């Protein structure tokens, strides 16, 4: 018998977590509470309730919650204020969802008096780290059960056999479905496994579930205008929208125009390289637009400092340190920089491309056309000042050149 009496399981209703649910009941002889988060994965979450009930979970121990607004408002938006991108390409769609799920799991554990939490992340991936760092940051004494590190069900065939033996409904899996390991939320959908494990193999077109291919996107470009307030999008084409509403609309536009597909090999935190394919249509549009509005509203040195800090900030999110003090410190700096990031950006969407065609800030623009003009500026900029500026900046290089010449 285990000393664990009650565990909160992050539960999707799929094969893996349904097997985990039954395994927890059998191996730990404990009460299981299920938590299913709707973060915009694009499929019904209510079936998870019926699945949990069929596996013996009491109705009062089933938590299904719509977290889409919180996800975008408190996690996606703060991340995009930093123009966050991991290893030059990845927009962190999976990584940024884990802190919210971990947070809510711990809150439910405190609410129901659970002494443990559990997840379905494998022992090879980053998600086990992300979930568990979150758990410990928010509840230091919590017990964590990671079945993939304990059991011997280390293949899909063994999971299916266990499910059949224990009466777990697997009809959806047996009747087909995608061969890929997928993860989806309002920001992105990811694909891993099977043929993608050969990084030289191009994925089949029918793998991509969200977007049309750029080749098949409309031949007519579409324009979209985004309004920013303190670094966050508050309206699309003049229509005020909630954070989740903004991302939903940008996903629609991006999918229509073949925007946001990505095929990369990334360096996992656990040490291996992994090939993944991603569709992040709305996020791709957001990143381009945010950099555009910052280009006229941020001081040069502030913008450059943000760019220097961004890789570290991205690494913290990718590796699971959202709840760390260093991420919180960086977030305060990033958020402070956004006070003047107000205005609008106009974009042209065309066959996989996001093209900035206009930006304006009536209140906070640092772009002064009277100084930047190539025409007569009426004395706003004194060309002669450049000579001293250049000589002073060249001084150290002139000294170094003189030293080299003396050495022969």
From Swiss-Prot:
<keyword id="KW-0436">Ligase</keyword>
<keyword id="KW-0547">Nucleotide-binding</keyword>
<feature type="binding site">
    <location>
        <position position="122"/>
    </location>
    <ligand>
        <name>L-aspartate</name>
    </ligand>
</feature>
<feature type="binding site">
    <location>
        <position position="37"/>
    </location>
    <ligand>
        <name>ATP</name>
    </ligand>
</feature>
<feature type="binding site">
    <location>
        <position position="126"/>
    </location>
    <ligand>
        <name>L-aspartate</name>
    </ligand>
</feature>
<feature type="binding site">
    <location>
        <position position="130"/>
    </location>
    <ligand>
        <name>L-citrulline</name>
    </ligand>
</feature>
<comment type="pathway">
    <text>Amino-acid biosynthesis; L-arginine biosynthesis; L-arginine from L-ornithine and carbamoyl phosphate: step 2/3.</text>
</comment>
<feature type="binding site">
    <location>
        <begin position="10"/>
        <end position="18"/>
    </location>
    <ligand>
        <name>ATP</name>
    </ligand>
</feature>
<feature type="binding site">
    <location>
        <position position="90"/>
    </location>
    <ligand>
        <name>L-citrulline</name>
    </ligand>
</feature>
<dbReference type="InterPro" id="IPR014729">
    <property type="entry name" value="Rossmann-like_a/b/a_fold"/>
</dbReference>
<dbReference type="GO" id="GO:0000050">
    <property type="term" value="P:urea cycle"/>
</dbReference>
<dbReference type="InterPro" id="IPR024074">
    <property type="entry name" value="AS_cat/multimer_dom_body"/>
</dbReference>
<dbReference type="GO" id="GO:0005524">
    <property type="term" value="F:ATP binding"/>
</dbReference>
<dbReference type="Pfam" id="PF20979">
    <property type="entry name" value="Arginosuc_syn_C"/>
</dbReference>
<dbReference type="InterPro" id="IPR018223">
    <property type="entry name" value="Arginosuc_synth_CS"/>
</dbReference>
<keyword id="KW-0028">Amino-acid biosynthesis</keyword>
<comment type="subunit">
    <text>Homotetramer.</text>
</comment>
<feature type="binding site">
    <location>
        <position position="126"/>
    </location>
    <ligand>
        <name>L-citrulline</name>
    </ligand>
</feature>
<comment type="similarity">
    <text>Belongs to the argininosuccinate synthase family. Type 1 subfamily.</text>
</comment>
<feature type="binding site">
    <location>
        <position position="278"/>
    </location>
    <ligand>
        <name>L-citrulline</name>
    </ligand>
</feature>
<dbReference type="GO" id="GO:0000053">
    <property type="term" value="P:argininosuccinate metabolic process"/>
</dbReference>
<dbReference type="InterPro" id="IPR048267">
    <property type="entry name" value="Arginosuc_syn_N"/>
</dbReference>
<dbReference type="GO" id="GO:0004055">
    <property type="term" value="F:argininosuccinate synthase activity"/>
</dbReference>
<dbReference type="Pfam" id="PF00764">
    <property type="entry name" value="Arginosuc_synth"/>
</dbReference>
<feature type="binding site">
    <location>
        <position position="95"/>
    </location>
    <ligand>
        <name>L-citrulline</name>
    </ligand>
</feature>
<dbReference type="InterPro" id="IPR001518">
    <property type="entry name" value="Arginosuc_synth"/>
</dbReference>
<feature type="binding site">
    <location>
        <position position="190"/>
    </location>
    <ligand>
        <name>L-citrulline</name>
    </ligand>
</feature>
<feature type="binding site">
    <location>
        <position position="120"/>
    </location>
    <ligand>
        <name>ATP</name>
    </ligand>
</feature>
<keyword id="KW-0963">Cytoplasm</keyword>
<dbReference type="InterPro" id="IPR048268">
    <property type="entry name" value="Arginosuc_syn_C"/>
</dbReference>
<dbReference type="InterPro" id="IPR023434">
    <property type="entry name" value="Arginosuc_synth_type_1_subfam"/>
</dbReference>
<dbReference type="GO" id="GO:0006526">
    <property type="term" value="P:L-arginine biosynthetic process"/>
</dbReference>
<dbReference type="GO" id="GO:0005737">
    <property type="term" value="C:cytoplasm"/>
</dbReference>
<keyword id="KW-0055">Arginine biosynthesis</keyword>
<protein>
    <recommendedName>
        <fullName>Argininosuccinate synthase</fullName>
        <ecNumber>6.3.4.5</ecNumber>
    </recommendedName>
</protein>
<feature type="binding site">
    <location>
        <position position="127"/>
    </location>
    <ligand>
        <name>L-aspartate</name>
    </ligand>
</feature>
<keyword id="KW-0067">ATP-binding</keyword>
<feature type="binding site">
    <location>
        <position position="181"/>
    </location>
    <ligand>
        <name>L-citrulline</name>
    </ligand>
</feature>
<feature type="binding site">
    <location>
        <position position="266"/>
    </location>
    <ligand>
        <name>L-citrulline</name>
    </ligand>
</feature>
């Amino acid at each position: 018998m285990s000393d664990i009496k009650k565990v909160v399981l992050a539960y999707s209703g799929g094969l893996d977590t349904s097997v985990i649910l039954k395994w927890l009941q059998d191996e730990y002889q404990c009460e299981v509470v299920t938590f299913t988060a709707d973060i915009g994965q694009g499929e019904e979450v209510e079936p998870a309730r019926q699945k949990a009930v069929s596996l013996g979970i009491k109705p009062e121990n089933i938590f299904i919650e719509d977290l889409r607004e919180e996800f975008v408002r408190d996690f996606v938006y703060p991340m995009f204020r930093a123009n966050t991108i991991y290893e030059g390409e990845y927009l962190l769609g999976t990584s940024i969802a884990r802190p919210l799920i971990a947070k809510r799991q711990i809150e439910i554990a405190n609410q129901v008096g659970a002494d443990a939490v559990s997840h379905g992340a494998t022992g090879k991936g980053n998600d086990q780290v992300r979930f568990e760092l979150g758990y410990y940051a928010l509840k230091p004494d919590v017990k964590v059960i990671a079945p993939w590190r304990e059991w011997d069900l280390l293949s899909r065939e063994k999971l299916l056999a266990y499910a059949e033996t224990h009466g777990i409904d697997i009809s959806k899996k047996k009747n087909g479905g995608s061969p890929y390991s997928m993860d989806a939320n309002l920001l992105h959908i990811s694909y891993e496994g099977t043929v993608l494990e050969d990084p030289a193999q191009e994925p089949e077109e029918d793998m991509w579930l969200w977007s049309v291919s750029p080749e098949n996107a409309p031949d007519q470009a579409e324009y979209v205008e985004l309004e920013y307030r303190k670094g966050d999008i508050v309206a699309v084409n003049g229509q005020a929208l909630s954070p989740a509403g903004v991302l939903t609309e940008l996903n629609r536009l991006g999918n229509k125009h073949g925007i946001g597909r990505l095929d990369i090999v990334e360096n996992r935190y656990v040490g291996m390289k992994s090939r993944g394919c991603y569709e992040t249509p709305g996020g791709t549009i957001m990143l381009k637009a945010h950099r555009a509005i910052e280009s006229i509203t941020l001081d040069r040195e502030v913008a450059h400092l943000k760019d220097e800090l961004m890789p570290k900030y991205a690494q913290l999110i990718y590796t699971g340190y959202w709840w760390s003090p260093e991420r919180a410190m960086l977030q305060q700096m990033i958020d402070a920089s956004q006070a003047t990031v107000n205005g609008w950006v106009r974009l042209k969407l065309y066959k996989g491309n996001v093209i900035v065609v206009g930006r304006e800030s009536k209140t906070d623009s640092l772009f002064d056309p009277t100084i930047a003009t190539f025409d007569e500026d009426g004395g706003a900029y004194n060309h002669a000042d450049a000579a001293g500026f250049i000589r002073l900046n060249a001084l150290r290089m002139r000294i170094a050149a003189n030293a080299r010449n003396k050495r022969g």
